[in-house]
């Protein structure tokens, strides 16, 4: 995709101290850029391939192996083996060759950083607009949204309390009482859904055993549930 000259000085301002004008690209002249900024030309192995190529292109002394060709960010590897050798030297990979380097370049196609110039061998084109966008750090709200989504997924999944399927109920009498209390109050106990609570018949039997006198009902609220649970504790041990 051919980019207009308006987007290209943005990248040059980011990585090169001597930006060029729009007319330079429109006229198809060869850019005469200065050396890359110190942050790019440190020579560390952390440099990315696209930065390395810009570093070579910034120095006309490298025209024997790589050079700008025309405008619109197009360049050509005049000696692809030499470019690959230098890239391997920078990354401490002595087995680097053009086949491996070209595979790395293809990674940039999907990122809209670079594209292959069809019909020209060893010719590529920088997409400066896509490269500038790729260099933008993700917004802070994106990290917050990702964290919130992960927390919501964990809560929905019950990951904090879920037990393996097929596990027999543990011999802990308090859990059966807890289920009975929750069932009487109409609330499911969070985190202990693995143990089913008593059915309605059992709850009615517990109430009748505690309050045999007609018209006498358990007190409202959790106190009645506690009383019923205490009385029926032996039935669920």
UniProtKB/Swiss-Prot annotation:
Sorted UniProt keywords:
Developmental protein, Differentiation, DNA-binding, Neurogenesis, Nucleus, Transcription, Transcription regulation
Listed GO MF terms: DNA-binding transcription activator activity, RNA polymerase II-specific; DNA-binding transcription factor activity; DNA-binding transcription factor activity, RNA polymerase II-specific; double-stranded DNA binding; RNA polymerase II cis-regulatory region sequence-specific DNA binding; sequence-specific double-stranded DNA binding
Alphabetized PROSITE patterns for the sequence: ETS_DOMAIN_1, ETS_DOMAIN_2, ETS_DOMAIN_3
Instruction: Show the Pfam families listed in the entry.
Output: Ets
The reply to whether tRNA processing figures as a keyword in the UniProt entry is no
- Annotated localization: Nucleus
Q: Which GO terms describe its cellular component?
A: nuclear speck; nucleus
Q: Which domain of life is it from?
A: Eukaryota
Q: In which tissues is it expressed?
A: Specifically expressed in central serotonergic neurons. Also expressed in adrenal gland and to a lower extent in small intestine and eye.
Q: Could you say which protein family the record assigns here?
A: Belongs to the ETS family.
What does this gene product do?
Answer: Functions as a transcriptional regulator. May function as a transcriptional repressor. Functions in the differentiation and the maintenance of the central serotonergic neurons. May play a role in cell growth.
The entry's protein name is: Protein FEV
Q: Which organism is it from?
A: Rattus norvegicus (Rat)
């Amino acid at each position: 995709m051919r980019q207009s000259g308006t987007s290209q000085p943005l990248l040059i301002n980011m990585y090169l101290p001597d930006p060029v004008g729009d007319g330079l690209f429109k006229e198809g002249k060869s850019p005469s850029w200065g050396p890359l900024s110190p942050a790019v030309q440190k020579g560390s192995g952390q440099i990315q391939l696209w930065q390395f190529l810009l570093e070579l292109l910034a120095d006309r002394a490298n025209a024997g192996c790589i050079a700008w060709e025309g405008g619109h960010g197009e360049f050509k590897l005049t000696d692809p083996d030499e470019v690959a050798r230098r890239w391997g030297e920078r990354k401490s990979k002595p087995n680097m060759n053009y086949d491996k380097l070209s595979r790395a370049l293809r990674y940039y196609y999907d990122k809209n950083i670079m594209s292959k110039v069809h019909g020209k061998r060893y010719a590529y084109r920088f997409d400066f607009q896509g490269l500038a966008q790729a260099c933008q750090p993700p917004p802070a709200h994106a990290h917050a949204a990702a964290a919130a989504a992960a927390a919501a997924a964990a809560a929905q999944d019950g990951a904090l309390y879920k037990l393996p399927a097929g596990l027999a109920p543990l011999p802990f009498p308090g859990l059966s009482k807890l289920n009975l209390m929750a069932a009487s109050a109409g609330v499911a106990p969070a985190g202990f859904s693995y143990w089913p609570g008593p059915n309605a018949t059992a709850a009615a039997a517990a109430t009748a055993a505690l309050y045999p006198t007609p018209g006498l009902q358990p007190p409202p609220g959790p106190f009645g549930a506690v009383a019923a649970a205490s009385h029926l504790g032996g039935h669920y041990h």
